[in-house]
């Protein structure tokens, strides 16, 4: 029986960055890992309606820095920054060190696998037909410039007695190409018939140059210089 490696795991260090970037000795490693897990668990539960894509944790010099990638930064920040300050205090209590929280906006949620999967699950929980939800997600991603997308749902689809798997693909999704920038994520829809699993693969193109090209900050587009009009003498 064929087995598939995790699409993100095999690309770590090639074209995918880690979600936790810190170094610890043997004594501190387990505690750091445990607090990382608890911080992610708390933020995921607290920001369930804020369209959170990923949470990146860094630990510089006895402190913790959490970057929340979200499509709805206004909900995370709250009125005058009250909500984000509350999150910062709880994260500091969980980690036991001073905390800093940064918010990064996801510009195109239709091209983010986690947000697409969450969108499909929320539609399934509202009793939208699964085929319609899948096709809508595929069309939106391709319209916004994805090279390819594959969506798979499995479970008691439409309330059927026997669980089955259905998938829909458009474009190309080259899983064997390690330099391919493939965003993969999953989500679960809790319906009256049981749990329906959703998997999403989005191919955004190939990254040439490895991690150096990934970590390079995007340069802002150069604005054309305005020509100064000479005044009449």
UniProtKB/Swiss-Prot annotation:
InterPro entries the UniProt entry points to: KH_dom, KH_dom-like_a/b, KH_dom_type_2, KH_sf_prok-type, Ribosomal_S3_C_sf, Ribosomal_uS3_bac-typ, Ribosomal_uS3_C, Ribosomal_uS3_CS
Domain of life where this protein originates: Bacteria
Domain KH type-2: 28-96
Gene Ontology molecular-function annotations: mRNA binding; rRNA binding; structural constituent of ribosome
GO biological process, one term: translation
GO cellular component, one term: cytosolic small ribosomal subunit
SUPFAM superfamilies xrefs: Prokaryotic type KH domain (KH-domain type II) (SSF54814), Ribosomal protein S3 C-terminal domain (SSF54821)
Pfam family, one: KH_2
Annotated source species: Shigella flexneri
Transmembrane segments: none
PANTHER family tied to this protein: 30S/40S RIBOSOMAL PROTEIN S3 (PTHR11760), SMALL RIBOSOMAL SUBUNIT PROTEIN US3C (PTHR11760:SF19)
Entry-linked Gene3D superfamilies: 3.30.300.20, Ribosomal protein S3, C-terminal domain
Similarity section: Belongs to the universal ribosomal protein uS3 family.
Subunit structure of this chain's protein: Part of the 30S ribosomal subunit. Forms a tight complex with proteins S10 and S14.
Name by which UniProt lists this protein: Small ribosomal subunit protein uS3
Keyword set, alphabetical order: Ribonucleoprotein, Ribosomal protein, RNA-binding, rRNA-binding
Taxonomic lineage: Bacteria, Pseudomonadati, Pseudomonadota, Gammaproteobacteria, Enterobacterales
Primary role: Binds the lower part of the 30S subunit head. Binds mRNA in the 70S ribosome, positioning it for translation.
NCBIfam families per record: rpsC_bact
